[in-house]
Amino acid sequence: MNVSAIVVEYNPMHNGHLYHIEKTKKLTNCDALVCIMSGNFVQRGFPSILDKWTKANMAISNGVDLVIELPTLYSLSSAEFFSFGAVSILDSLNIINSICFGSEIGNINALQDIATTLLEEPLEYKILLKNYLDKGISFAKARNLALVELNRDNKIMSENISKILSLSNNILGIEYLKSLLLLNSSIKPFTITREGADYKDENLHEEYSSASSIRKYLKENKNINILKDFLPLEGFLEFKRLITKGYNFSMEDSMINYIRYKYISGYKNLHNLIDVSEGLDNRIYKSLEKNFTYDSLVGEIKSKRYAYSRIGRILCQYFIGFENYDLNSLLKSTPNYMRVLASNERGLKVLKEVKKHSSINIYTKLPKNTNTLLSLDIKATNAYSLLNNNIRFNEDYFRSPTIIKNTIY
């Protein structure tokens, strides 16, 4: 069985994601497609606009065969750990033949070359990186500058690296490749050229609009019909059904009062989070005292050293309660389970193959005794239930995977 995989967030699913699914199937000629998906919180530091079960069902309705949850620890981590969490789970299944991701460059060889350098870290690169970090530059920017300078004698390569590393999907793709190399994985990587608007673009465009633009529209408007051209048909119909039922979309602003209350109540333990360097915790506390919206709060805290998405992830982690866990140890380990959110009949065949070839624990219902990684997911869903009145406290214990039969794909 030729099984391919994709790593997704679907916040929310749009036409660009459908294009990714269709191109992956064509490029890899796979018999089945597995996706590992962020749950109720996503990597840019936002609550997901739709809950993880609704997102998973949409994925199955649009051509995915099996949806696995990416543990929240990884979905709210840097690109490096986000990628490692996803790839390590896929690798441990022992049945995934290929992985396909979107990138702005669409050239797997160029991305592989950079990934190899970053993983091997030659001495000159390490020295350059340290010099830039000592100047107070963010890690991502310092890494880019170090790579460019490392290739300064090759002007064409240097210019290409600078361009490649300025674009988010290229960066994420490099991290997937690094993880595959680190794990010595047999999974073959493919990349497709990303189509459509940049993820930061908040304006709706014909055919391929960004998830950011769709979230902004849903936040500010009631007429869902405008989005018909920007969403897969099944996704659009699901949005209409949810709105009719009174579903409330989870937005980042809805977290702020809870975060401010936690701080006011004396929970000043941000320093326990691994992304919080010395002094950043006090910077955040001061900003919490006077900012009442997500954008104003993050906007005041961010700097050339602290990127917007990093601050957003810290706020989500604080909201959930990550600071009470030994995150360093968790991130150094590999997950020993996969949590199934949804499947079709072909996906059930994939699960049978996993059982034959892997010792990984497969969870369709939560076990009585949960490990730390899984307990963080439960905690995340409970925090998410404060933002989305369609999700109950301890919803993870009530939900089983949706099995969708006779899908057209």
Curated annotation (Swiss-Prot):
GO cellular component terms listed in the entry, alphabetical order: cytoplasm
Reaction it catalyzes: cytidine(34) in elongator tRNA(Met) + acetate + ATP = N(4)-acetylcytidine(34) in elongator tRNA(Met) + AMP + diphosphate
Keywords linked to the UniProt accession: ATP-binding, Cytoplasm, Ligase, Nucleotide-binding, RNA-binding, tRNA processing, tRNA-binding
GO biological process: tRNA modification
Biological source species: Clostridium botulinum (strain Langeland / NCTC 10281 / Type F)
GO molecular function, one term: ligase activity, forming carbon-nitrogen bonds
Pfam families in the record: HIGH_NTase1
Protein name in the entry: tRNA(Met) cytidine acetate ligase
Binding site for ATP: 7-20, 102, 169, 194
Enzyme's top EC category: ligase
Record-stated family: Belongs to the TmcAL family.
SUPFAM superfamilies: Nucleotidylyl transferase
Subcellular location: Cytoplasm
E.C. no: 6.3.4.-
Functional description taken from the UniProt entry: Catalyzes the formation of N(4)-acetylcytidine (ac(4)C) at the wobble position of elongator tRNA(Met), using acetate and ATP as substrates. First activates an acetate ion to form acetyladenylate (Ac-AMP) and then transfers the acetyl group to tRNA to form ac(4)C34.
